[in-house]
Amino acid sequence: MNKFAIVLAAGKGTRMKSALPKVLHQVAGKSMLAHVLKSVSEVEIAKNVVIVGHEADRVIATLPKGTQFVKQVEQLGTGHAVRIAADLLANEEGATLVIAGDTPLITGETLGALFDYHFAQKATATILTAIAPNPTGYGRIIRDEKDSVEKIVEQKDANAFEKSITEINTGTYIFDNKSLFKALTEITTDNAQGEYYLTDVIEIFKKVGQTIAAHILDDFDESLGVNDRVALSQAEATMRKRINHEHMVNGVTLIDPATTYIDSEVTIGAETVIEANVTIKGNTFIGKNVLITNGSRIENSEIHSNCEVRNSTVEESRMSVGSNVGPYAHLRPGTVLSEEVHVGNFVEIKGSTLGKGTKAGHLTYIGNATVGEKVNFGAGTITANFDGKNKFNTEIDDFAFIGSNSTIIAPLHIGKNALTAAGSVVTEDVPDEAVEIGRGKQVNKLGRAKKMPHYRGQ
């Protein structure tokens, strides 16, 4: 049987107190809507329709290529939101999943089980329910004397007895598609909210003797709908625990999972060790047997096997096998370290490529440079690559030795096996195998110190 999906992503999310549409708020580095769409994609959906409304164009811009959408111009309730998908779905034969775009914790496995249960029960509607420790705010599942689902009552419409019920509606359903769209033509706004409730179709089905099933969630956390920043933080914490658990069972050591923040798209190889207070974001790849020490931050980068990142920041950069950085180094966007490169403490590199075995041990800035193999940078070296308007490139060939406190005024080229003397200001190209000296000659004025303010006598 064909499977379809309607993802509700039209709401403003007033309680978020944000200019950003609610479904675009991120959990573990990815929007809530993206999490939901990923889970939906795991159950072989024939047609997926996203209902957009508030800031529709911003939401549409984030959708995967080819995703169908419908704009809900007026937000008149969940029933209305589903009904406007009729032109795309009403004539289809099959079962339709309806799910909110602000439920980032629900998994593809759960949605697959929900479809299986729906088909096994031969139901017209199947509700994903959960037993809530505190059901306040949720719609309640009302069952009859035979324990069959009778209806769903929203919090604002519930009486005292109904409010005491702990089985809640998670807001995720599967319906027989044609029955759903037929029933949606019969719902009204006769309720406390003055809206078209999707849940009213349950009573319509029940009155004509159709089967209503309820599948209870094993993990209540999956039911979390995010309506404010508090719930957003809860979703973040739960997602982080899931992510960290998955990495650990796959052979990654997390010294302190409670302070380790790893986004959902990060890949990490076995035998890697990650210490406390580490953040790894975006589309980051980390190979095998990598050490990442306390306080490091890595974003949208590639760190290959046998590397070390010690108390450092790595952004949009690539570290090849056996390279190491830190402590307190900063690889800025566009940096590429070849194999066995060493970048030490208080070194900043931007938009540069360093060849195999090159070393920049301390207090160095390298920007917009192409550096060969086994080049050594002495402490205090900088490439002066910016004239206030334009950036300029520096080329340094294999085996060059850059003396401490050298200032390299780009653009220029330093040749193979060349050496710059300590303290030099390099303003011209340096040929292969040349020694460059770009500093004033030292002069010692004997006895002059006695006339200086610092002098304290013999």
Curated annotation (Swiss-Prot):
Cellular localisation: Cytoplasm
Linker: annotated segments: 230-250
Keyword Cytoplasm tagged: yes
Cofactor(s) for this UniProt protein: Mg(2+)
Residues annotated as the enzyme's active site: 362
Keywords: Acyltransferase, Cell shape, Cell wall biogenesis/degradation, Cytoplasm, Magnesium, Metal-binding, Multifunctional enzyme, Nucleotidyltransferase, Peptidoglycan synthesis, Repeat, Transferase
Pfam families for the chain: NTP_transferase
InterPro entries: Bifunctional_GlmU, GlmU-like, GlmU_C_LbH, NTP_transferase_dom, Nucleotide-diphossugar_trans, Trimer_LpxA-like_sf
EC number: 2.7.7.23, 2.3.1.157
Protein residues bound to acetyl-CoA: 379, 404, 422, 439
Reaction(s) this enzyme catalyzes, per UniProt: alpha-D-glucosamine 1-phosphate + acetyl-CoA = N-acetyl-alpha-D-glucosamine 1-phosphate + CoA + H(+); N-acetyl-alpha-D-glucosamine 1-phosphate + UTP + H(+) = UDP-N-acetyl-alpha-D-glucosamine + diphosphate
GO cellular component: cytoplasm; membrane
Cofactor: how and how many bound: Binds 1 Mg(2+) ion per subunit.
Binding-site list for Mg(2+): 102, 227
Location of the region described as N-acetyltransferase in the Swiss-Prot/TrEMBL record: 251-458
Region (Pyrophosphorylase): 1-229
Chain residues that bind UDP-N-acetyl-alpha-D-glucosamine: 8-11, 22, 72, 77-78, 139, 154, 169, 227, 332, 350, 365, 376
Pathway given in the UniProt record: Nucleotide-sugar biosynthesis; UDP-N-acetyl-alpha-D-glucosamine biosynthesis; N-acetyl-alpha-D-glucosamine 1-phosphate from alpha-D-glucosamine 6-phosphate (route II): step 2/2; Nucleotide-sugar biosynthesis; UDP-N-acetyl-alpha-D-glucosamine biosynthesis; UDP-N-acetyl-alpha-D-glucosamine from N-acetyl-alpha-D-glucosamine 1-phosphate: step 1/1; Bacterial outer membrane biogenesis; LPS lipid A biosynthesis
Molecular function terms from GO: glucosamine-1-phosphate N-acetyltransferase activity; magnesium ion binding; UDP-N-acetylglucosamine diphosphorylase activity
Assembly description: Homotrimer.
Function per UniProt: Catalyzes the last two sequential reactions in the de novo biosynthetic pathway for UDP-N-acetylglucosamine (UDP-GlcNAc). The C-terminal domain catalyzes the transfer of acetyl group from acetyl coenzyme A to glucosamine-1-phosphate (GlcN-1-P) to produce N-acetylglucosamine-1-phosphate (GlcNAc-1-P), which is converted into UDP-GlcNAc by the transfer of uridine 5-monophosphate (from uridine 5-triphosphate), a reaction catalyzed by the N-terminal domain.
Family matches, as PANTHER family: BIFUNCTIONAL PROTEIN GLMU, NUCLEOTIDYL TRANSFERASE
Family: In the N-terminal section; belongs to the N-acetylglucosamine-1-phosphate uridyltransferase family.
Protein name: Bifunctional protein GlmU
Gene: glmU
